[in-house]
Amino acid sequence: MISLSDLRKFKTEGRKFSCLTCYDASMAKAMEFAEIDSILIGDSLGMVIQGHDSTLPVTVDDMAYHTAAVRRGNQHSFIMTDLPFMSYATLPDALNNAKKVMQAGAQMIKIEGGAWLSESIRVLTQNGIPVCVHLGLTPQSVHVFGGYKLQAKTREAADQLIADCQAVVDAGAAILLLECVPAQLGQEIAELFPQTPVIGIGAGKETDGQVLVAQDMLGLSFGKVARFVRNFMKEQAGETAIVDAFKAYHAAVQDQSFPAREHTFQVEL
């Protein structure tokens, strides 16, 4: 089973690692066969699985249920689980809800925010709960941002995001996840924190790992698709097409053919 130490080692060795969202045991097993390095049980299940138009209605019980299902199906990948909207607003809530998803099978919890999370990160880490912090476009704050848009488009905004990264790493964050930021900034942050793995989704090819929503990269999302998505499924054929698509994604992350320039945001900062 891949561990947090392994992800840190991958970064040190310059070996890019793959991450996909997953919500059920059968898909988790397919990812195990494909040797996907990490799985995120994301609160994106609110839209992908439950049919909501945002992640906001998802509950901690939902996250624990899907975490347990994924863990039963996959004994290979490192597993992270989102704490959903307003489930970590207070320290007691953060501890109790993190405990619930860790007991369900998560190896790490993920929360969205910035420097203001420092105390929660410190307390969670002191209690043996590894923390990934999601920065940039944070879907739980979609109404604050006014929709799903590129973040940190100016040098000032980029520097603020870097300051937030520094604050949460100083507080104990073990992984950073950057969403929908310029490729240049993704590279800059990955280089600024040599001991902290940085995962990107729409953050350029130079982050240490890449994550996509599995349904997006399998072409199962209908309507407008984000710029940073590549459909790996349409490149496959045959009875094991899904596993082959996962394998192709894993290989493309490792050899850095994904994300290509057309999947990134090029902004002069």
Curated annotation (Swiss-Prot):
Chain residues that bind 3-methyl-2-oxobutanoate: D43, S44, D82, K110
Cofactor binding remark: Binds 1 Mg(2+) ion per subunit.
Enzyme Commission (EC) number: 2.1.2.11
Family the entry assigns: Belongs to the PanB family.
The keyword Transferase appears for this protein: yes
GO molecular function, one term: magnesium ion binding
Protein name (record): 3-methyl-2-oxobutanoate hydroxymethyltransferase
Gene Ontology annotations of biological process type: pantothenate biosynthetic process
SUPFAM superfamilies: Phosphoenolpyruvate/pyruvate domain (SSF51621)
CDD domains (UniProt xref): KPHMT-like (cd06557)
Record key words, sorted: Cytoplasm, Magnesium, Metal-binding, Pantothenate biosynthesis, Transferase
Pathway linked to the protein: Cofactor biosynthesis; (R)-pantothenate biosynthesis; (R)-pantoate from 3-methyl-2-oxobutanoate: step 1/2
Family matches, as HAMAP family: PanB
Subcellular location: Cytoplasm
Known catalytic reactions: 3-methyl-2-oxobutanoate + (6R)-5,10-methylene-5,6,7,8-tetrahydrofolate + H2O = 2-dehydropantoate + (6S)-5,6,7,8-tetrahydrofolate
Chief localization: cytoplasm
Function comment: Catalyzes the reversible reaction in which hydroxymethyl group from 5,10-methylenetetrahydrofolate is transferred onto alpha-ketoisovalerate to form ketopantoate.
